[in-house]
């Protein structure tokens, strides 16, 4: 990404401070890699009072010469601030600002975060920043205070008085963010999209690159917030804990049976896929495209084996599954899909399931995340999530066969219920095309194995055991 023309010059000490601070942030993708902060550019001023706050683009360069660009809104204070000590980036000399400045992550500073809402409501233009209101800016809670949601991996989200949620994209790519693109398209459908949150506004940036060509990127999106909703992962975990507490009962006999919700989630997923197909382009995969798709999966497997040697035991069966996809009959329907679908990406409100985060897998290039794909990718992702929900607690009980048996039963029951709901709402049954389903599930499990090896080694047996079952199922 080309740098913006600087509005505010960064103190010479600030890049080195950020180089120390960035690896500790959950959303920073370069953990464990050597890098330098190569460039900092300010896009525009968020606030000047009570404290100066700017939106910065920070470009890092790794030892292998790869680069990434991050959005880092910073607030500069003339003295330490106890309420934001936990997000202190560092202090620098500053003769123009009382002698020294203390720099903090501005998204955690409640004295300045309201500027995001005000900017969207007013449609402000500030420097290279553009604040774009949704269809009802008068509904925005301009006097609200913000609360940062914990647990996010790749973005930072702020809730404003349980009325709206602002998702700030930390990793910045030139071009339209797929989450905003999808929500805008769905909002234009007649009647809207019942299972997707309303888009209330967004923030974008426009600048000139070093060669003079124009560039744009999306920085944040504002949506309605569902105060009393619970995410699907938490609900599923409660059901699994109930099952483990009464392991002598079948999954269907336990009070916290999840199959009804899984069925309704399948219905909601089919409706969302239908809405996406109405609002955005569709197509089919011909023979060459299927071969290419299988080749991508094969390459991901080869790369993964280098990181997770345990995958070599399954590589032969996985290659068979991917070769079968390459030889699949042409004409596989494709469309825009969610791309990173799992139980943590859905909310259960008092009335319905709501689907969140249409960004796709953050680590993939933007062109791949915005491309057309089979809806089976989403179905496979959710099926894998049911496996995780059933088995993640087994990491603490590895030698209890009764619990393992019940976990298998819970996963199978809810996987089937989810797909039954999908078919009930008009979606095609992926079980009638096992080659497609096995390939997408295997591709997802390979991705999971790499993630667990790097982040949660005790969970690595979950995707490995799933791969063994997938290979056996594909061969049978």
Over which residues does each language-model region extend?
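Conserved catalytic-loop position in the HRD/HxD motif
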Residues: 340
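Short Lys/Arg-enriched alpha/beta "domain-start" segment
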Residues: 2-39
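ATP/Mg2+ or Mg2+-diphosphate-binding catalytic cores
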Residues: 405-431, 435, 439-476
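Short amphipathic beta-strand and strand-loop transition segments with alternating hydrophobic
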Residues: 33-49, 57-59, 204, 325-326
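Conserved catalytic-core element of eukaryotic-like protein kinases
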Residues: 335-337
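Active-site catalytic-loop/activation-segment of kinase and kinase-like phosphoryl-transfer enzymes
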Residues: 285-323, 409, 413-425, 450
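Conserved ATP-binding subdomain of kinase catalytic cores across diverse folds
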Residues: 53-302, 351-352, 356-408, 412, ...
């Amino acid at each position: 990404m080309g740098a913006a023309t600087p509005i505010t010059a960064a103190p010479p000490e600030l890049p080195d401070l950020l180089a120390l601070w960035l690896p500790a942030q959950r959303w920073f993708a370069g953990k464990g890699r050597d890098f330098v902060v190569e460039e900092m550019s300010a896009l525009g001023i968020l606030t000047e009072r009570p404290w100066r706050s700017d939106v910065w683009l920070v470009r890092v360069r790794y030892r292998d010469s790869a680069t990434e660009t991050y959005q880092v809104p910073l607030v500069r204070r003339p003295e330490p601030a106890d309420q934001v000590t936990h997000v202190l980036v560092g202090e620098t000399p500053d003769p123009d600002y009382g002698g020294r400045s203390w720099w903090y992550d501005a998204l955690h500073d409640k004295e300045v975060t309201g500027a995001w809402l005000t900017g969207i409501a007013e449609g402000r233009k500030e420097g290279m920043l553009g604040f774009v209101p949704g269809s009802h800016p008068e509904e925005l809670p301009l006097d609200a205070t913000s609360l940062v949601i914990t647990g996010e991996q790749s973005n930072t989200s702020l809730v404003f008085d349980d009325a709206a949620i602002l998702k700030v994209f930390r990793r910045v790519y030139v071009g339209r963010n797929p989450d905003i693109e999808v929500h805008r398209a769905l909002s234009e459908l007649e009647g809207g999209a019942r299972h997707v949150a309303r888009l209330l506004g967004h923030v974008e940036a426009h600048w000139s690159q070093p060669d003079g060509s124009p560039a744009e990127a999306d920085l944040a999106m504002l949506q309605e917030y569902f105060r009393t909703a619970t995410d699907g992962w938490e609900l599923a975990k409660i059901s699994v804990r109930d099952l483990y507490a009464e392991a002598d009962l079948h999954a269907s006999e336990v009070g916290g049976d999840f199959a009804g919700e899984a069925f309704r989630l399948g219905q909601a997923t089919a409706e969302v896929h239908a809405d996406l197909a109405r609002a955005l382009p569709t197509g089919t995969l011909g023979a060459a495209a299927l071969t290419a798709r299988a080749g991508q999966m094969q390459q991901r497997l080869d790369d993964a084996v280098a990181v997770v040697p345990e995958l070599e035991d399954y590589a032969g069966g996985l290659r068979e599954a991917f070769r079968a996809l390459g030889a699949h009959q042409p004409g596989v329907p494709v469309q825009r899909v969610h791309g990173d679908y799992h139980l943590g990406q859905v909310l259960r409100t008092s009335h319905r399931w709501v689907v969140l985060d249409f960004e796709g897998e953050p680590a993939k290039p933007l062109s791949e995340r915005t491309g057309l794909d089979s809806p089976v990718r989403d179905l496979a992702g959710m099926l894998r999530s049911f496996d995780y929900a059933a088995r993640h607690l087994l990491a603490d009980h590895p030698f209890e066969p009764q619990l393992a048996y019940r976990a298998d039963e819970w996963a199978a029951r809810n996987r089937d219920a989810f797909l039954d709901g999908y078919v009930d709402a008009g979606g095609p049954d992926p079980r009638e095309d096992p080659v497609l389903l096995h390939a997408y599930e295997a591709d997802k499990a390979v991705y999971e194995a790499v993630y667990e090896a790097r982040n949660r080694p005790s969970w690595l047996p979950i995707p490995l055991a799933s791969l063994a079952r997938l290979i056996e199922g594909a061969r049978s």
